[in-house]
Amino acid sequence: MEVLIAGVLLTAVLTAVARFSTLAMAGSNHQKDRQAIEASINDNIQLIQQADSQITVNRLLDDNDGFFDTSNLVQACGSGSPSSNAASFLMTQISNGEVSVAPPELSTTQTDYSLQRNFSIINLGSTYMLKVEYQFEGPEENVDTEYRVIEISPSFEAGCYQ
C-alpha cells in the first residue's frame, strides 16, 4: 500500500515538472521569436536612417557624382504641399528610389507574424515628416497586433530653406 501511494505521489510530481518544463520551453520560443522580430525592425530602422543620411544637399546639387543625377534639390524639396515635399521625396527614395530599403523579413521565426511596414506623411503645419510604422502579431498568447513607429525629418530638408 505504501509503495502504491509513493508511486502516485511520484507520478504527480513528475507530471507537474513536465508541465512546467513544457511551459518554460514554449515561453522560450516566444521570447526568441520576439527578439527576432524586434531585431529585424531595429535593423530596418537603422537602414532607413542610413538612407536618409545619404541624401545630402551636396549630392542633390551635383548632377555628375552618380547619386541622384535624375533629381535635384528643387525636386527633392518639392513645393511644400502635402503631395510634394521633402518627406514625400524621402519616402519615394526609401520605397523604390536610389537608396531603397527593403521591408524587414523574419527568416528565423517558426511562425509567420505578418510583419508589415507602412509609410505616411505627417503634416506639421509648415513642414512634413515621414512616419514609418511597423505592424506585427505578438508571439505571446493573448497579445494582439503591436506597432513600432518612428518619425523622420529628412536630413537634407534644411537645404530647402536656403
Describe these PLM feature segments.
Residues 42-162:
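Low-complexity, Gly/Pro-rich coil/beta segments used as flexible assembly/activation regions
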Residues 1-45:
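Aliphatic-rich helix starts adjacent to a transmembrane/signal segment
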